[in-house]
Regions:
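Extracellular/oxidizing-compartment recognition motifs
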Residues: 11, 17, 22-415, 424, ...
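Short, surface-exposed charged micro-motifs
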Residues: 64, 296, 756-758, 765
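Beta-strand elements of well-folded, non-transmembrane domains
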Residues: 69, 118-120, 752, 761, ...
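Generic recognition of long tandem-repeat/solenoid scaffolds
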Residues: 274-275, 283-286, 343-345, 593, ...
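Short "repeat-start/strand-capping" segments in structured domains, especially the N-termini
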Residues: 351, 761-762
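Active-site core of glycosidic bond-cleaving carbohydrate-active enzymes
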Residues: 420-746, 752-756, 763-777
């Protein structure tokens, strides 16, 4: 037990490992009693290894399922879906799920079936480590069934193995060949394969709330016909061709729907009914809000049939109905089914607002489509009503966005990547606290980083740009590593807990050593290695980032300051203050902060490259303020609006992208007294998204993810605008002294009850739960934190 506890994050060590009197329930939480990791012999390291395992057991009072796996599992009890998991963990670890089976058991014999996937490929979503399943059904006094003793299994041949990936960032797409009903498959004993011990991992508690599996019905909204337009064009996206991802060669694909579907043309028909569809016909389904989860189809096949399911976060442009490659994905699920009843949900979670079902051959009737949701139920805790319905609607869209991106770790999107990106997490973590009253998902995210071993393809001291992940090359973003330490400080202040910071001491020391290598004679970072990334705009062009990149140095100064405060290092605080002055001296040309300087004859020379985003980095980092650079601040506030015509205003100055430039702009405007300007801009920016998909987007347009975690930060901006709430400092509630702009009622959750704010007419007041107290601040802040 002590050996196990030595490997656990400090959060759990402080809660359990330091106690000498752990009760039996605590011990059981950290380990399996008898289960061992297993897999089907010879398949634990193969690409896209999908297996079925099963065990029969007698019903018993208090029975629970304890389970983990790598990469993922889906559990069924007596044919009924139980759960998908586990929550992701660092290399060498696995998070353990525990479920009560009390309400699901039937008298006598019960059958547990587990569908498990070991992807064994490189991705931003899961680890490239050997597959295993570890599970047991138990009561307080007995183990009723466990892997290594009672489970049988087989390769899940119904799922086609050699297929295209879903995306560059995620593993393999889904194609199935069912010779009998899936309901029969998931309610039958799995046998025929040799189940053997496998390489496992150190178990950890799940740490986060179990997801909500609410079913969302998609309504039939159209139908039509399709036909082959011409010979299929080769579908050769990078995730189809780059061998370093660990993929199957195209020549070995057993099916390739992305290619043959690309040759189809569509003809809309009349009516919406999906009661009967023949070969060459399609039905279209939609939902009012973009949903994240498992796509489920139910129908009756009048004969053996082939069906393709295309899905996307928005309706396609005519003549296509669903652009299944729009978001850099192969968003297709393919089925070959036998005559009879059929019902199946995708193994993996995806996102969809529009779903198109194509009958490739055969005939089906009574088609129904739904999504089994996969989201964080705690996001419902924030309550807000407001006389401005636009603000209400944006907050509701932010709620959906946060819930879908805070399931096991903080993710960028629940579609293309499901990856735990730094920088994004800084913003979504603040939103998690606002919506849920806690930061359980961020804690798990930061624990994974703290537990991550040194990765072979990264320089010494560097942390991965997203995690848990196994990259296909040595790509890393030094700027995102800076955001890691900035977030650690923000998390510590926000939660009042030092667990994450204490667990990350070595990571912080490693990063400080890493960046010190690039400091020049002025203390400025010069010729940073890796992918110097600021945002997707001209600010990130090679001409702007080479040499001494000033936005990177502005962020470095903030990183040093936050790290100094976090660990009580006065020398880092002094270094940060000095660096801010140095950056301003070298970057500011009298009107604007320039983006970079390069060496010419041994001297640093500014090159006249100016981005709008650089200006916001300056104010966000504390290099600039309205007091020190008042003229620039006024110009940015009044003239450099999102609607700026760059050919007339600020000629030659690159416009920002949504993330991160526009977000930094909104923060700067809010904190430095331009609340009404900020409100006008964020309503204009986010409201159209909320109306169209009920979620908030990666970009200002529809070219990327339409459900992106960091965008939930819109709710933080709105709540601050309405009542002055700026977040928590432990149990202190930070409140700016403002005049509320309209009538509203807000309940901000905490573990002890909500912080309430009411504004009616000229009267407004706060009410605080026991243990929480206000910390009032000036409406115009001293720094943009």
């Amino acid at each position: 037990m002590q050996k196990l506890l030595r490997g656990l994050p400090s959060l759990y060590l402080s809660a359990a490992g330091e106690s000498k009197k752990m009760n039996i329930r605590e011990r059981q939480y950290f380990m399996f009693r008898k289960a061992i990791p297993v897999w089907i012999e010879g398949h634990s390291c193969e690409l896209n290894s999908i297996c079925l395992f099963s065990a029969e057991f007698d019903a018993a009072e208090g029975a629970e399922l304890v389970i983990t796996a790598n990469s993922f599992y889906k559990a069924y009890l007596n044919g009924e879906f139980v759960a998908f998991g586990p929550a992701r963990a660092a290399h060498g670890y696995c998070r353990v799920d525990r479920f009560s089976l009390a309400k699901r058991l039937r008298q006598g014999k019960n059958l547990l079936v587990v569908e498990a996937a070991g992807y064994n490929c490189r991705s931003f979503y899961s680890l490239d480590t050997p597959a295993f399943l570890q599970a047991e059904v138990r009561t307080e006094s007995a183990v009723l069934a466990c892997t290594g003793r009672d489970f049988t299994g087989r390769v899940f041949a119904e799922r086609v193995r050699k297929v295209c990936r879903f995306s560059y960032q995620r593993a393999f797409s889904e194609s199935y060949r069912f010779s009998r009903s899936p309901a029969e498959v998931y309610a039958a004993v799995a046998k025929g394969g040799k189940v053997v011990p496998a390489e496992g991992a150190e178990p950890l508690p799940r740490g986060v709330t179990y997801p909500q599996y609410e079913s969302y019905v998609f309504r039939a909204c159209g139908r039509g016909t399709f036909a082959v337009r011409n010979a299929p064009a080769p579908f050769r996206e990078r995730y189809v061709t780059e061998k370093r991802l660990k993929i199957f060669p195209v020549s070995e694909f057993e099916t390739f729907p992305a290619e043959y579907i690309g040759a189809f043309s569509y003809m809309p028909g009349r009516g919406r009914s999906a009661r009967l569809l023949r070969a060459g016909e399609y039905a279209l389904f939609s939902c009012g809000v973009l949903r994240a989860g498992f796509i489920r189809l139910s129908f009756c096949a009048a004969e053996n049939s082939r069906v393709a399911v295309l899905f996307d976060e928005i309706a396609g442009e005519p003549p296509a109905v669903v652009d299944f490659t729009r978001n850099g994905c192969c968003a297709v699920i393919e089925y070959s089914v036998a005559k009879g009843g059929f019902s199946h949900a995708s193994f993996e979670p995806y996102t969809a607002k529009t779903i198109q079902v194509l009958v490739l051959s055969g005939k089906i009737a009574d088609l129904r489509v739904s999504v089994v949701g996969f989201s964080n139920p705690d996001a419902c805790r924030l309550r807000l009503s407001c006389s401005d319905v636009r603000l209400e609607r944006i907050v509701e869209a932010a709620r959906h966005t946060l819930a879908d991106n805070a399931v096991d770790i903080l993710t960028d999107c629940p579609s293309r990547e499901r990856a735990g990106w730094l920088c994004d997490s800084f913003f979504s973590a603040r939103s998690e606290r606002l919506f849920t009253g806690e930061n359980r998902t961020e804690q798990a995210f930061l624990e994974n980083y703290a537990l991550a071993p040194p990765l072979e393809n990264l320089p010494e001291g560097m942390v991965p740009m997203c995690y848990p992940a196994d990259f296909e090359d040595g790509t890393y973003i030094p700027n995102w590593a800076m955001w890691y330490l900035i977030e650690l400080y923000d998390h510590t202040v926000r939660t009042g807990s030092r667990a994450a910071a204490d667990a990350a001491v070595r990571k912080a020391e490693g990063l400080l050593r890493y960046f010190a290598r690039f400091e020049n004679e002025f203390g400025l970072l010069e010729d940073l290695e890796g992918w110097v990334f600021l945002e997707w705009s001209g600010a990130n062009s090679a001409e702007f980032t080479k040499g001494v990149n000033f936005p990177s140095n502005m962020l470095y100064a903030k990183m040093l300051e936050c790290t100094g405060r976090l660990y009580g290092k006065q020398e880092l605080l002094e270094k940060a203050a000095s660096l801010k002055v140095t950056v301003a001296r070298h970057s500011f040309n009298g009107s604007f902060f320039e983006d970079n300087a390069v060496r010419e004859d041994g001297r640093l020379v500014r090159k006249g490259h100016i981005s709008e985003t650089c200006q916001y980095y300056a104010f966000f980092s504390g290099v600039a303020s309205p007091e020190t650079h008042g003229k620039l601040f006024v110009l940015l506030s009044e003239k450099f609006t999102p609607a700026r015509d760059a050919s007339r205003v600020g000629q030659g100055i690159c416009k920002p992208n949504a993330f991160i430039g526009e977000y930094l702009r909104l923060i700067v405007l809010m904190r430095f007294g331009r609340r009404e300007r900020a409100a006008k801009e964020f309503i204009q920016f986010f409201y159209r998204m909320a109306r169209r998909t009920g979620t908030l987007w990666e970009n200002s347009g529809t070219e990327g993810s339409l459900n992106h975690g960091f965008a939930a930060y819109a709710a933080d901006l709105i709540v601050e605008y309405l009542c002055g709430f700026r977040g928590f400092r432990g149990n202190a509630v930070r409140i700016a002294r403002i005049a509320p702009p309209c009538n509203c009622r807000i309940e901000i959750p905490t573990p002890c009850g909500p912080v309430r704010f009411v504004c009616e007419g000229s009267e407004s007041f706060f009410d605080f739960p026991e243990g929480f107290y206000p910390e009032y601040e000036n409406a115009v802040a001293h720094e943009a934190n």
